[in-house]
């Protein structure tokens, strides 16, 4: 009986992979759980999915990535929905351009793929603040990931608006969305089942009733994070031999009857600033994938394609005490690299999927070549001090969120009322500071390595103290995210005495291209402008090794962060973001100087030598 079921199951999977028409329904279909497995239109269905995130991929490349997914043998793709991208200010929604998640899902369907949707509202994902909009932190009494009405009200409003975009695309309405995840790994955070029920209720009220709801946790966290009447996915990695068997054995102690779904199969890992570039054991990962597929279990690769956390969107990790900001690249050592090119891992997984499903996948699409750009100089500059906005005066320090700011930098300025010599202490530095006295740099402090104080010699009353603070990325994991405000969130003391009376300058750096640049030397924190010409539009990798720490924009598009501690030394430049003819690069660098150069490489440098 079991053998006959598996034979029929394998046939259904093979047909689903081989026939795009099955993933392009023109009429309503059903997707449910029956007899311990997923069923599509009352037939067993094995999900073989891969995760990729629409804001981490240039819109012009979405369809190419989907075709690569089909060619590897996948029958579905998985994506989070990133609340902070869609509601940057309360009630102001953005589903345009790269935020058009509905179009992303429609294109997936057109390319023969089902969709597993993960709307959060919390998503983790090594993404800024786990996908939460920073404005939630303005109310210091609001409790994230809880039944606090101050949190539930904006979350429910957000889900209702998202439902207008995506509920029509559920499989029961003729769309490709087969699964919708309730929250995300909540069992690693808490065990408030009333909150999980409320989150499920918000999704139902938003119209997510024509697909199958589920929860996802680590196997041991399922009791804390799951809902008893919903199927569960479990999240784990395959670097260790036999990992999949062990994880599902653990799950079966709690949920012996299935369905069995590895909702995040970690096939790589992410990088922190100051650490190594991650790489994982592809052979063991392929073996664990092979074992799961042979059992008839469903799986979603995390990640199939990582892409890039463009601009300010990298997250950070913490164990509750430390701080580990993520780099801009989300290459993840995944089957498709950061720029969408298949790796050795892609070929290995493709072979496993074809063998286990008995289906011949489509041919792997040809990949356009990358290009080099000759070295060019950043010859124009303007000092940050010359483009400061109007100040907000406050007796006490205020955070970015207190001032309605989400990302970027913030400057705290004051006049010291007496000569003194002692320790300057920044209590609650989030995250990186450069300290100036009368315009001269006296030191840097880095939350990443738990730096909080430096020696300060104030020669006379009236000296100007400037503290320039960078938001290096909000923590996206751990309960500490509830207090993850940026700037200085405590007090500044000198020789044990609190300093008050501040001029505060919010520096979101939304449009640095509007500054007035000139050919001149620049000291301290500076914006640099450079231009280069191309006649061919192709991907390249901008080598920023000549700069120290800051941010880069290309033709007005935010590319990401620069930090000379590595491991990342290049920033991915998508070909569609280039112009034929002149292109503009702006670099904000905390360390001024002259002779700064840039170069476009045909391969990335994500850790050590070019990949």
Model-derived segments and spans:
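The substrate-binding groove and active-site-proximal loops of carbohydrate-active enzymes
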Residues: 47-58, 83-100, 137-156, 181-192, ...
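Aromatic- and acidic-residue-enriched segments that line the glycan-binding/catalytic groove
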Residues: 91-99, 110, 120-146, 160, ...
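An active-site-proximal structural segment forming one wall of the substrate-binding cleft
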Residues: 100-117, 140-177
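Catalytic-core region of carbohydrate-active enzymes that cleave or remodel glycosidic bonds
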Residues: 206, 210, 239-337, 341, ...
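Aromatic-lined substrate-binding rim segments of carbohydrate-active enzymes
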Residues: 62-128, 200-205
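N-terminal carbohydrate-binding accessory modules
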Residues: 23-76, 106
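Active-site neighborhood of glycoside hydrolase catalytic domains
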Residues: 151-229
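Aromatic-lined ligand-binding clefts that engage carbohydrates, nucleic acids, or primary amines
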Residues: 422-436, 465, 532-555, 562-563, ...
